């Protein structure tokens, strides 16, 4: 065969280009070239750019179904568990995995039925994410994955609420629950700033460290104005933090103390670089404290060992007044169904998610435990007026914390699901 007689593809293409049809297309040649360059750029970006940071739902959301979008939002998780709806538990579901108020790790203030609440319907709901299912909590598996490890909760009393919930959930897999003990012999109480429960069979400790601001709170600088009683040092991470190094799971939270009642009205202002700053606003201080938290995590924690979570803001449901001005939450017995009554996402969450987004390349095991939306529905599940025994009848209702068993159990189910997605297991 004469190779010189073979057809020349390029010659044929240019020959075709001289036809009337392609002559018309020449008019729009600049459009064709532009589109070609754009497609080439997109393909190059997908191939070359670090795929860990590529989020297809942002670029090509119009090509994805709602179900796909729900899964994509979770990045490396199988699902975005933070969006869904509350559905009633089926009566045929095995209840043996659920604990009751007899769990000895519960603070008296969270035992709502024991404190006089008549309805128990608030315990009959489960969270159903959109587009997927939340894995069933497996206490035995969680304990085994955490063998010889430490699970640490750091934050305010809402964090203690979640910590107590997890203790009760994990203890369901322990036949002799009396073996579980507090390492210092202390009773579980809101008056204790540090509590550590040991599961001896697994050599596991589950700890709670009370640090409402996460950063240092202390005396103001010398010669401060008389109205300054204390300061929040936004650039100094809490002194207890040295105890958290080496933890396998850390769950941080803060937010409920970041308001004017707990700061300015109480004579508490902000301090940075050793200097008092009375002009710094609460949310500016909050943002700066998160930067301090971020620096500590990146500098002090082992990115291979420590699985770090920052829980989002837990909504409050005071109606007809604030907590100290007659606010109530004892009238509701079912989750909210009117979306118009739902509060917008707190600005705290924007700062938290942004801080975590900035950390993703340096510490891939830092996650945003987003529970705000699902919790906003649950106006029915607070202790309200069913507080700990001995509380005066005219005391403010508790519309911040949660009855247990209750909503924090769902937070821990999501925590467990996210750990599974991360292939969590202590080393």
Swiss-Prot record:
<dbReference type="Pfam" id="PF14416">
    <property type="entry name" value="PMR5N"/>
</dbReference>
<dbReference type="Pfam" id="PF13839">
    <property type="entry name" value="PC-Esterase"/>
</dbReference>
<dbReference type="InterPro" id="IPR025846">
    <property type="entry name" value="TBL_N"/>
</dbReference>
<dbReference type="InterPro" id="IPR029962">
    <property type="entry name" value="TBL"/>
</dbReference>
<dbReference type="GO" id="GO:0016020">
    <property type="term" value="C:membrane"/>
</dbReference>
<feature type="transmembrane region" description="Helical; Signal-anchor for type II membrane protein">
    <location>
        <begin position="31"/>
        <end position="51"/>
    </location>
</feature>
<keyword id="KW-1133">Transmembrane helix</keyword>
<protein>
    <recommendedName>
        <fullName>Protein trichome birefringence-like 8</fullName>
    </recommendedName>
</protein>
<feature type="short sequence motif" description="GDS motif">
    <location>
        <begin position="155"/>
        <end position="157"/>
    </location>
</feature>
<dbReference type="GO" id="GO:0016413">
    <property type="term" value="F:O-acetyltransferase activity"/>
</dbReference>
<dbReference type="InterPro" id="IPR026057">
    <property type="entry name" value="TBL_C"/>
</dbReference>
<comment type="similarity">
    <text>Belongs to the PC-esterase family. TBL subfamily.</text>
</comment>
<keyword id="KW-0735">Signal-anchor</keyword>
<keyword id="KW-0472">Membrane</keyword>
<keyword id="KW-0812">Transmembrane</keyword>
<comment type="function">
    <text>May act as a bridging protein that binds pectin and other cell wall polysaccharides. Probably involved in maintaining esterification of pectins. May be involved in the specific O-acetylation of cell wall polymers.</text>
</comment>
<feature type="short sequence motif" description="DCXHWCLPGXXDXWN motif">
    <location>
        <begin position="398"/>
        <end position="412"/>
    </location>
</feature>
């Amino acid at each position: 065969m004469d190779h010189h007689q073979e057809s020349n593809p390029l010659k044929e293409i240019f020959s075709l280009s001289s036809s009337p049809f392609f002559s018309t297309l020449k008019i729009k040649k600049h459009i064709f070239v532009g589109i070609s360059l754009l497609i080439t750029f997109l393909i190059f970006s997908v191939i070359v750019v670090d795929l860990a940071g590529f989020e297809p739902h942002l670029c090509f959301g119009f090509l994805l179904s709602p179900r796909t979008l729900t899964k994509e939002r979770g990045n490396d998780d199988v699902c975005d568990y933070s969006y869904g709806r509350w559905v009633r538990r089926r009566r045929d579901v095995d209840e043996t995995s659920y604990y009751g108020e007899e769990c000895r790790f519960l603070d008296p203030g969270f035992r709502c039925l024991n404190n006089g609440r008549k309805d128990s319907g608030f315990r009959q709901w489960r969270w159903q994410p959109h587009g997927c299912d939340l894995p069933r909590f497996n206490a035995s598996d969680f304990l085994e994955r955490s063998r010889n490890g430490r699970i640490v909760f750091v934050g305010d009393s809402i964090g203690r609420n979640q910590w107590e919930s997890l203790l009760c959930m994990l203890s369901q897999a322990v036949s002799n629950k009396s073996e579980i003990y507090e390492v210092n012999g202390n009773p579980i109480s809101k008056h204790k700033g540090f509590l550590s429960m040991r599961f001896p069979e697994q050599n596991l400790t589950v700890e709670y460290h009370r640090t409402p601001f996460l950063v240092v709170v202390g005396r103001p600088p010398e010669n401060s104005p008389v109205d300054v009683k204390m300061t929040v040092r936004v650039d100094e991470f809490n002194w207890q933090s040295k105890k958290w190094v080496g933890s396998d799971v850390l769950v941080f939270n803060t937010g409920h103390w970041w308001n004017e009642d707990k700061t300015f009205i109480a004579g508490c202002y902000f301090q940075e670089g050793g200097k008092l700053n009375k002009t710094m606003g609460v949310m500016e201080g909050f943002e700066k404290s998160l930067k301090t938290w971020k620096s500590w995590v990146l500098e002090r924690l082992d990115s291979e060992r420590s699985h770090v979570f920052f829980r989002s803001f837990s909504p409050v449901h005071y109606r007809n007044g604030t907590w100290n001005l007659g606010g109530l939450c004892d009238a509701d017995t079912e989750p909210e169904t009117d979306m118009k009554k739902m509060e917008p996402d707190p600005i705290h969450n924007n700062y938290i998610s942004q801080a975590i987004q900035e950390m993703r390349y340096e510490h891939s095991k830092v996650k945003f435990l987003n529970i705000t939306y699902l919790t906003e529905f649950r106006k029915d599940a607070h202790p309200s007026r069913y507080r700990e025994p001995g509380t005066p009848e005219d005391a403010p209702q508790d519309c911040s914390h949660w009855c247990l068993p209750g909503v924090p159990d769902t937070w821990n189910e999501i925590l467990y699901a996210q750990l599974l997605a991360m292939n969590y297991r202590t080393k």
